[in-house]
């Protein structure tokens, strides 16, 4: 189904509210973290112009970090907030809100992988590369080697599965829901985020605990809840994106039925995933040590923190700015890349 057919249905759309039966929290450092995050983004020239800067200010990514990692030490929380603003902007500018593929796509994405692999930037860094290197070096200094590699592997998979997402948008018709779920699980950026959840609470869990099947299943359910809820909440923006617009709701609509019915189908899946997450979380917690309980708590903070951020803090997905925020093609020019090179 072409997005031109779906866009007129947006104005009458009724979006659900999601509820989880555990309390949220927020770091007391939220305002300071947010302000320093903006200063950091300015330092690395991530904000291309005044309009771009205003978009970031109203998104409040530092508040997302404060809600998802409320117990994190201030230094770690600041790195996470800086990572958030970099990731949202890079994901928009490299993948989501530009042409499906351009002459810079491979250069941009491989540069991000190289920073992880070599702990250095290229001779002619692309936009955001030096900021990304700074985030990685600060995280390396705060985490042990194996926990950092969990984060790094999540980011490598973000950059590589972005290629699968691009392939899906080159096709005249989307892949099915199962294939989409695989792509979404990794392009969302949730895996690197949840990889920091234990360190932000009671410390990093041991590898043999982190990779146990039930723990990994719990991480995947947390990932699914946030991703699929976001597919509903960001729908008004994503449908208007020039290159990447097929999410779970849109794919269900392509298979037949109205956009409203597709929202309700996706919402039912989110609710079912929340129930499954709760059941599995109880089972894992029953035999967990202190650090593993911290990971489970961290996943809960992420789910609730994201939902509270959308409801109370951010303007990233509101209708008022959807049309203008959905298109970054005016930013993705050779002049921008050259401006941020050193």
From Swiss-Prot:
Enzyme class of the recorded protein, top EC level: lyase
Site (Plays a critical role for substrate recognition): 92
Note describing how the cofactor binds: Binds 3 Mg(2+) ions per subunit.
Site feature location: Plays a critical role in the stabilization of intermediate cation: 88
Alphabetized InterPro entries for the sequence: Isoprenoid_synthase_dom_sf, Terpene_cyclase-like_2
SUPFAM superfamilies to which the protein is assigned, alphabetical: Terpenoid synthases
Keyword entries, A-Z: Lyase, Magnesium, Metal-binding
Catalytic activity: (2E,6E)-farnesyl diphosphate + H2O = (+)-corvol ether B + diphosphate; (2E,6E)-farnesyl diphosphate + H2O = (+)-corvol ether A + diphosphate
Residues the record lists as binding Mg(2+) 1: 91, 96
Binding site for substrate: 184
Domain-level remarks: The Asp-Asp-Xaa-Xaa-Xaa-Asp (DDXXXD) motif is important for the catalytic activity, presumably through binding to Mg(2+).
Name the UniProt record assigns to this protein: Sesquiterpene synthase MBR_09977
């Amino acid at each position: 189904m072409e997005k031109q057919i779906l866009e007129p249905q947006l104005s009458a759309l009724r979006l659900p509210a999601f509820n989880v039966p555990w309390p949220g929290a927020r770091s007391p450092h939220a305002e300071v973290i947010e302000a320093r995050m903006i200063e950091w983004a300015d330092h690395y020239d991530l904000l291309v112009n005044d309009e771009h800067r205003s978009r970031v200010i109203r998104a409040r990514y530092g508040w997302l970090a404060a809600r998802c990692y409320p117990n994190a030490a201030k230094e770690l929380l600041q790195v996470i907030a800086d990572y958030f603003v970099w990731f949202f902007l890079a994901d928009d500018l490299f993948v989501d809100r530009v042409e499906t593929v351009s002459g810079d796509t491979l250069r941009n994405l491989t540069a991000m992988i190289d920073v992880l692999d070599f702990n250095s930037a290229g001779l002619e860094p692309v936009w955001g590369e030096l900021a990304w290197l700074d985030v990685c070096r600060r995280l390396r200094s705060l985490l042990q080697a194996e926990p950092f590699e969990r984060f790094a592997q999540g980011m490598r998979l973000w950059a590589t599965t972005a290629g699968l997402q691009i392939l899906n948008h080159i096709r005249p018709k989307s892949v099915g829901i199962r294939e989409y779920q695989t792509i979404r699980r990794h392009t969302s950026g949730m895996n690197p985020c949840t990889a920091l959840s234990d360190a932000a609470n009671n410390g990093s869990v041991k590898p043999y605990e982190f990779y146990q099947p039930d723990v990994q299943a719990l991480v995947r359910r947390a990932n699914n809840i946030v991703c699929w809820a976001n597919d509903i909440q960001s729908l008004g923006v994503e449908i208007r994106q020039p290159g990447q617009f097929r999410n779970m709701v849109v794919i269900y609509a392509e298979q037949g039925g109205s956009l409203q019915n597709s929202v309700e189908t996706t919402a039912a899946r989110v609710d079912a995933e929340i129930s499954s997450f709760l059941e599995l979380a109880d089972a894992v917690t029953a035999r967990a040590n202190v650090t593993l309980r911290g990971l489970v708590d961290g996943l809960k903070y992420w789910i609730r923190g994201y939902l509270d951020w959308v409801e109370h803090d951010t303007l990233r997905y509101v209708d008022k700015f959807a049309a203008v925020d959905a298109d970054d093609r005016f930013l993705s020019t050779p002049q921008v890349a050259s401006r941020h090179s050193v």
